[in-house]
C-alpha cells in the first residue's frame, strides 16, 4: 500500500471518528433537552395549599410554585391515585396529606381520646376521620393502627356499634363483580376486606373498609364471628 493510500485511509478513519463523536454529542444533548422539556412541562400554577404541600414533601417552603415543586407534587399524586396528576397543590392533594399526618400522629396510641369503647373486650375500631383501624382488647392495643380506605361520598361507611356476622376468606362480590379476600361482614354488605390498591386513593370505597392484604389477613386471624366493631368519625370529603 502506498503512502498516499495510507494517508487516505487515516483521513477517512479520523473523519468517521469525528462523525461518530458528533452524533453521540447530539444524542446526549437531545436526551438532556428532552429531560429539561419534560420537567418544564409541569407548569401547574401556585395552589391554595402550596406552603402546606411544600412542607409535607420536604420542599423549600416559599408558597410559590416552581418546576421542581410541580414535579414533586405530580409524583405524589401519581403514587396515591390523585387525579388530575397535574402537580397542583389543591384541596384533594392536601386532604390526602392531612390524613397521612393524622395517621402518623396516632403512633401506637390511636385511642388516646377513648372514642372507641374499652369495656367490650376485643373490638375492631374504625376511625373514619383519620382513616385508621386497629384491634384492641379493653385498653390494650392488639394490632395496628393501620391505614384503611372507607366509603366515598354517597356510599359512606355507616357509623355505630356493629358485630361481625359473616366471614368468607374467598368472597366474590356479585354486586361489583370483584374478589373480596378475607371478607368479614359487620353491617349489611359492609365488610373488612383486602384490596390491591393504595389506601389513600380517592375518592374511596363503595362502603366497605378496604385494607392492605397483610392487614386484612391479620384481621381474619384475630377476629371471629360475633366480635364487636365500632365505627366513628367522618371521612374527609364526605
Predicted regions span which residues?
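A structural motif detector for short, solvent-exposed N-terminal "entry" segments of globular domains
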Residues: 111-154
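Secretory-pathway/luminal and periplasmic proteins that interact with or process carbohydrate-rich
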Residues: 79-84, 103-107, 143, 157
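Sec/Tat-exported extracytoplasmic proteins
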Residues: 57-61, 77-84, 101, 137, ...
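Exported/periplasmic cell-wall-interacting domains
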Residues: 19, 40, 104, 108-121, ...
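Secretory targeting and sorting signals
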Residues: 1-39
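Extracytoplasmic/secreted envelope proteins and their assembly/folding machinery
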Residues: 50, 54, 70-73, 94, ...
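Short acidic, glycine/serine/threonine-rich helix-capping segments at coil-helix boundaries
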Residues: 40-100
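A mature extracytoplasmic/lumenal domain signature
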Residues: 89, 93, 101, 130, ...
Amino acid at each position: 500500500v502506498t503512502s498516499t493510500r495510507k494517508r487516505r485511509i487515516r483521513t477517512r478513519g479520523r473523519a468517521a471518528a469525528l462523525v461518530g463523536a458528533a452524533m453521540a454529542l447530539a444524542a446526549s444533548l437531545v436526551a438532556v433537552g428532552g429531560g429539561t422539556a419534560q420537567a418544564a412541562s409541569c407548569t401547574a400554577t401556585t395552589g391554595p395549599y402550596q406552603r402546606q404541600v411544600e412542607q409535607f414533601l420536604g420542599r423549600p417552603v416559599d408558597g410559590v410554585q416552581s418546576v421542581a415543586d410541580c414535579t414533586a407534587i405530580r409524583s405524589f399524586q401519581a403514587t396515591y391515585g390523585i387525579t388530575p396528576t397535574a402537580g397542583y397543590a389543591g384541596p384533594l392533594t392536601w386532604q390526602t396529606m392531612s390524613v397521612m399526618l393524622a395517621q402518623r400522629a396516632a403512633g401506637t396510641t390511636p385511642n388516646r381520646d377513648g372514642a372507641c369503647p374499652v369495656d367490650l373486650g376485643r373490638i375492631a375500631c374504625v376511625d373514619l376521620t383519620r382513616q385508621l383501624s386497629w384491634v384492641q382488647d379493653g385498653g390494650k392495643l392488639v394490632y395496628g393502627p393501620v391505614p384503611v380506605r372507607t366509603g366515598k361520598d354517597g356510599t359512606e361507611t355507616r357509623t355505630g356499634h356493629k358485630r361481625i356476622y359473616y366471614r368468607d376468606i374467598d368472597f366474590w362480590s356479585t354486586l361489583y363483580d370483584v374478589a373480596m379476600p378475607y371478607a368479614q361482614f359487620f353491617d349489611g354488605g359492609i365488610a373488612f376486606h383486602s384490596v390491591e390498591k393504595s389506601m389513600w386513593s380517592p375518592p374511596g370505597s363503595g362502603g366497605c373498609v378496604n385494607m392492605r392484604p397483610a392487614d386484612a389477613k391479620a384481621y381474619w386471624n384475630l377476629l371471629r364471628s360475633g366480635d364487636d366493631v365500632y365505627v366513628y368519625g367522618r371521612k374527609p370529603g364526605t
